[in-house]
């Protein structure tokens, strides 16, 4: 017993010595933090630092509450708490049966982690976020609940930090500049493409997708799909109109197909979608809005519907690679489409080194390329810019039944070699041949036939430097001053109408002119009418020698006799015979 007591005393002394030695000599080189109380979303926790050698407790620290982490429904992913924002200020709408959000009851620039706009307040629905409601607020996530259908203009004015945004399927109207001054990290839309098409955006700064770093939309499985990974969109027939700015920011789209039932494509609907290569429009579509496909620089193929009536200005501006247009209607319908400006025509911005191909359905309902244009006899008017930049078009025939031709109808038709048309100009007040070409007659054009000319006006063929042959018939009675002046490649002209006078310098400087046919109705050659026609070889006068000699000549270069080698008149048998120029 005595020995046991002595052993216990010795052991106690030794342990005391060890701990005293550690406390005096341990440098606490290895420590660790040990959690005593875990922090929750709302409660602080605690932890202490301890030496791993001597286990001495060196200090304690508070663990701050974690805060809620909300999903896109405003439910905390850790504790299940449903977000509410008591600081939201509401205002009763004029209908007295719904509320709108008008602000936050916090000091300016105060930080709030997550704001969830509820669907109800005071047992009435919340339907709207008012103008400037969240101006100058600081938060990192905004969740807008289902049932809210409108966000007023400038709702996030001066919100110059990055946030996440959750938009409900119910949203139907987003006013001007809602996202003009905001940086969006992630945008989540709780609806499908079809639902998205029902949102009305007032301007480009109303659409959040173009402002977001990442954006997501629900797919057919009701799962979020990153918009950046969507390559093809099919617009369902339940959508009557694709709204303005609808797909602004959907940069990954490569193909768009419109189902039967869609009638209109709004302004800037697909503007800036630079990866789209093909657009297929349903035959129910009647109009394409301003800048609808502006900046679609990869677009090569377009299928246009048979019922299209109007293509607004700049609809295809900066679509520089369009080479194939497939039209599902008849040629007479194409002539009646209203192209508001040059960039309404899908070929206008095409790189001039590319050949454009325009296809129409033939009798077998198969696409056939149009290279030789014959306007149907039931067409009365050809609208402006209808065939602009059809640079693979080789020939054109327009019947006398056409009464009006719009401006720039054939501008940019750089492969055109011959054209037959009823009049010079537009058929009304414009009387210049170059009018239908945007005053840039293609250098490829060699042969022109006018079948029902009402007049041949002053400088009517100005700029036709490459045209080689012109035939004119109709009821015109005079060839006005300088009508063909400077047509330096013109080598043959036939005048079949009952012209009475060929006026001043009408053919001056037509230095390649070798042959001309003149009607017997001519009574006068004006001053210098044939000045410098140095290549003139044959003159065919459709009258007798007596009629030829009776023509009034104003000066030496008025008459083709000054240059012609041979002049022919009709004999009694109505056959050409050469006359002696010297007698």
PLM segments and residue spans:
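Solvent-exposed loop and capping/linker segments of extracellular ligand-binding repeat ectodomains
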Residues: 22-25, 70, 74-583
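Generic, low-specificity signal for short hydrophobic/alpha-helical stretches with a mild N-terminal bias
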Residues: 4, 33-36, 316
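Hydrophobic alpha-helical targeting segments used for export or membrane insertion
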Residues: 11-16
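Bacterial N-terminal signal peptides that target proteins for export
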Residues: 1-10
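Thrombospondin type-1
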Residues: 22-83
């Amino acid at each position: 017993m005595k020995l046991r007591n002595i052993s216990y005393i010795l052991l106690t002394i030794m342990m005391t010595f060890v701990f005293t030695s550690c406390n005096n000599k341990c440098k606490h080189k290895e420590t660790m933090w040990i959690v005593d109380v875990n922090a929750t979303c709302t409660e602080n926790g605690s932890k202490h630092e301890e030496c791993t050698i001597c286990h001495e407790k060196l200090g304690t620290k508070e663990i701050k509450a974690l805060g809620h982490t909300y999903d896109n429904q405003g439910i905390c992913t850790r504790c299940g708490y449903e977000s509410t924002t008591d600081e939201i200020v509401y205002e009763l709408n004029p209908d007295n049966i719904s509320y709108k959000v008008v602000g936050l009851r916090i000091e300016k620039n105060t930080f709030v982690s997550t704001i969830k706009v509820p669907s109800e307040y005071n047992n009435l629905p919340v339907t709207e976020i008012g103008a400037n409601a969240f101006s100058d607020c600081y938060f990192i996530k905004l969740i807008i609940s289902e049932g809210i259908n409108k966000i007023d203009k400038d709702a996030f004015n001066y919100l110059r930090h990055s946030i996440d945004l959750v938009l409900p399927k119910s949203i139907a109207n987003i006013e001007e500049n809602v996202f003009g001054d905001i940086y969006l990290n992630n945008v989540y839309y709780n609806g499908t493409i079809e639902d998205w098409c029902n949102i009305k955006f007032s301007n480009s700064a109303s659409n959040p997708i173009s402002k977001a770093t990442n954006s997501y939309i629900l797919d057919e499985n009701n799962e979020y799909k990153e918009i950046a990974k969507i390559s093809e969109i099919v617009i369902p027939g339940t959508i009557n109109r694709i709204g303005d700015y609808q797909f602004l920011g959907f940069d990954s789209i490569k193909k768009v197909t419109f189902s039967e039932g869609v009638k209109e494509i709004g302004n800037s609907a697909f503007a800036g979608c630079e990866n789209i290569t093909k657009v297929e429009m349903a035959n129910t579509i009647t109009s394409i809005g301003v800048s609808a496909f502006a900046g679609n620089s990869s677009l090569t193929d377009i299928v246009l519907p048979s019922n299209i009536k109007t293509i607004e200005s700049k609809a295809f501006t900066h679509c520089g690679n369009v080479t194939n247009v497939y039209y599902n209607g008849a040629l007479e319908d194409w002539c009646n489409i209203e192209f508001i400006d040059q960039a309404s025509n899908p070929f206008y911005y095409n790189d001039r080194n590319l050949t454009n191909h325009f296809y129409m359905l033939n009798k077998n309902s198969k696409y056939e390329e149009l290279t030789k244009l014959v306007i149907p006899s039931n067409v009365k008017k050809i609208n402006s810019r209808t065939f602009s930049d059809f640079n693979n078009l080789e020939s054109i025939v327009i019947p006398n039944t056409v009464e009006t031709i719009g401006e720039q109808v054939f501008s940019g038709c750089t492969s055109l070699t011959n054209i037959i048309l009823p009049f010079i100009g537009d058929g009304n007040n414009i009387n210049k041949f170059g009018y239908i070409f945007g005053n840039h007659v293609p250098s490829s054009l060699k042969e022109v036939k006018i079948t029902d000319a009402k007049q041949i006006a002053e400088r009517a063929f100005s700029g036709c430097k490459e045209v080689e042959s012109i035939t004119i018939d109709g009821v015109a009675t005079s060839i006005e001053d300088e009508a063909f002046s400077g047509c330096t490649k013109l080598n043959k002209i036939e005048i079949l109408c009952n012209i009475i006078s060929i006026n001043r310098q009408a053919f001056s400087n037509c230095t390649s002119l070798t042959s001309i046919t003149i009607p017997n109705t001519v009574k006068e050659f004006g001053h210098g009418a044939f000045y410098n026609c140095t290549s003139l070889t044959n003159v065919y006068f459709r009258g007798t020698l007596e009629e030829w000699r009776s023509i009034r000549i104003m000066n030496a270069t008025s008459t083709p006799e000054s240059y012609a080698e041979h002049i022919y008149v009709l004999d009694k048998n109505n056959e050409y015979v050469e006359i002696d120029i010297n007698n």
